[in-house]
From Swiss-Prot:
EC numbers for this chain: 4.2.1.126
Pathway(s) it belongs to: Amino-sugar metabolism; N-acetylmuramate degradation
Keywords in alphabetical order: Carbohydrate metabolism, Lyase
Record-given protein name: N-acetylmuramic acid 6-phosphate etherase
Chemical reaction(s) catalysed: N-acetyl-D-muramate 6-phosphate + H2O = N-acetyl-D-glucosamine 6-phosphate + (R)-lactate
Keyword Lyase included in the entry's annotation: yes
Organism field: Lactococcus lactis subsp. cremoris (strain MG1363)
GO BP, sorted A to Z: amino sugar catabolic process; N-acetylmuramic acid catabolic process; peptidoglycan turnover
Quaternary structure, from the entry: Homodimer.
EC class (word): lyase
Keyword Lyase annotated: yes
Lineage: Bacteria, Bacillati, Bacillota, Bacilli, Lactobacillales
Length: 297
């Protein structure tokens, strides 16, 4: 039998013993107070998050991938963060990948036993053709999910970089990673429900890892997402606004260059900032490794 009694995420919260007797307002205040603790817990982990981001940047520069792996809520959060990288940063869906124990079906329904399989974690990475240039980030609130451990151990065999994210201290998965992240948010508002504070902490950290690593490979100019993909009307208008903000041009100028650049926001910005045509702008960006700032030198 697995002993979960020592895990912080499984302990009862002294502040919510009488949860079923609270009014809606009382429960809301309690839950909000618990949630306030999460950002401070994440702050404590910043020194351990930094090397994971550096490793992700290194992986991207080598043509490698960032691969999130988890089960249940942890897996879903990884899939969500990976999916958002495509429209936000204009990267291919293969560059940041989210894998969940049990496959796509597990995004909406529980797949019994999937998280308990070491072999399944290994096999999912084999199917993905894991390489030594990749970074695997195993996510498990409990810090002991076999699916994640199996994946991390296979990554070690291949020579890929390994990171882990747990919401318990001294987590088992930390022993299987080069770059372990452990966040102690305290017991959950609802005992054992790690979709709450643990899930919030994981989301905050995944936001940090994906966003700051993308900054590190030139996907941002100032604080603007210049590689955004205008896949709908809202994003088309946002793209023009980004061009205006980056170059201090008019709406009409932004629209003109946006169209000349074939709706490539970053290229339109370089064309305006360096007063060049589209082809020359492309050449400048290639020489600058995709960093807008470096085209201005």
């Amino acid at each position: 039998m697995i002993d979960l009694s020592t895990l912080t995420t499984e302990r009862r919260n002294d502040e919510t013993f009488n949860l079923d007797q609270m009014t809606v307002k009382e429960a809301l205040v309690k839950m909000n107070n618990e949630d306030k603790k999460v950002a401070y817990a994440v702050e404590e982990a910043l020194p351990n998050i930094e090397p994971v981001i550096s490793s992700a940047i290194e992986a991207f520069n080598k043509g490698g991938r960032l691969i999130y792996m988890g089960a249940g809520t942890s897996g879903r959060l990884g899939v969500l963060d990976a999916a958002e990288c495509v429209p936000t940063f204009g990267v291919p869906a293969t560059q940041v990948v989210g894998l969940i124990a049990g496959g796509d079906k597990a995004m909406t329904v529980a797949v019994e036993g999937a998280e308990d399989s070491l072999e399944l974690g290994r096999q999912d990475l084999i199917d993905l053709n894991l390489s030594e240039n990749d970074l695997v980030l195993g996510i498990a609130a409990s810090g002991r999910t076999p699916y994640v451990i199996g994946a991390l151990d296979y990554a070690k065999e291949i020579g890929a970089k390994r990171a882990s994210l747990s919401c318990n201290l001294n987590a088992e998965i930390s022993k299987h990673a080069e770059f372990p992240i452990e966040v102690d948010c305290g017991p959950e508002f609802l005992t054992g429900s790690t979709r709450l504070k643990s899930g919030t902490a994981q989301k905050l950290i995944l936001n940090m890892i994906s966003t700051i690593s993308m900054i590190g490979i030139g996907k941002v100019y100032n604080n603007l997402m210049v590689d955004v993909k205008p896949t709908n009307e809202k994003l088309v208008e946002r793209s023009k606004r980004i061009i205006m903000q980056a170059t201090d041009c008019t709406y009409e100028e932004a629209e003109e260059k946006f169209n000349e650049a074939n709706q490539d926001v970053k290229l339109a910005i370089v064309m305006l900032l360096t007063d060049c045509a589209a082809e020359e702008g492309k050449t400048k960006l290639v020489k600058a490794n995709g960093f807008v700032k470096n085209t201005l030198n």
